[in-house]
Amino acid sequence: MLLSDRDIRAEIDAGRLGIDPFEDSLVQPSSVDVRLDTLFRVFNNTRYTHIDPAKQQDELTSLVEPSPGEPFVLHPGEFVLGSTLETCTLPDDLAGRLEGKSSLGRLGLLTHSTAGFIDPGFSGHITLELSNVANLPITLWPGMKIGQLCLLRLTSPAEHPYGSAKVGSKYQGQRGPTPSRSYQNFIKLS
């Protein structure tokens, strides 16, 4: 079941759902707007000949931060990682779904490639997979509304929520745009 604005506010007021910093004006009829943080991860295209999800490639990306008051410019065809300004903490009976903003999608900005799902129990900044599919550069301003977080109530609390020892939650507590850690659970078939 998708939470309404009144349910979202009730979860926040009860201290079960954490969105920090929180502004009530960001609550929409069935979502909460999230804003863009100041940090970005850009790909170092000259460090590797290819991306291998089975290997740890620490120098694949570099962390960059625009000067205060300046935007990050995302050029056509480029892909970078960003993150939400807000730290989001979900209880064990709520899952999240990050969606893009329609107004930004109409400009050619994709907010996530595939990873828009947030497990119950997750706590941290949500990493954004930002792509420009337009024909012109797009300026990304830290603090701008970048997406909307929809919240779904589970039929029962998760037995092993994200962050529990059994799950192997490699992104729990992440701060800023976090690079892929796919190598930590990659299994090659023989």
From Swiss-Prot:
Protein name: dCTP deaminase, dUMP-forming
Enzyme class: hydrolase
Chain positions of site Important for bifunctional activity: G116, F117
Its biological purpose: Bifunctional enzyme that catalyzes both the deamination of dCTP to dUTP and the hydrolysis of dUTP to dUMP without releasing the toxic dUTP intermediate.
Region (Disordered): 162-184
UniProt-annotated catalytic positions: E129
HAMAP family the UniProt entry points to: dCTP_deaminase
UniProt superkingdom: Bacteria
Annotated binding of dCTP, by residue: K101, S102, S103, L104, G105, R106, D119, T127, L128, E129, Q148, Y162, Q174
UniProt entry tagged with the keyword Transport: no
Pfam families in alphabetical order: DCD (PF22769)
Catalysed conversion reaction: dCTP + 2 H2O = dUMP + NH4(+) + diphosphate
Gene: dcd
Coiled-coil stretches noted in the UniProt entry, renumbered to this chain: none
Organism placement in taxonomy: Bacteria, Bacillati, Actinomycetota, Actinomycetes, Mycobacteriales
EC number: 3.5.4.30
Ranges of Polar residues composition bias in the record: 171-184
Gene3D superfamilies per record: 2.70.40.10
Family per record: Belongs to the dCTP deaminase family.
PANTHER family: DCTP DEAMINASE
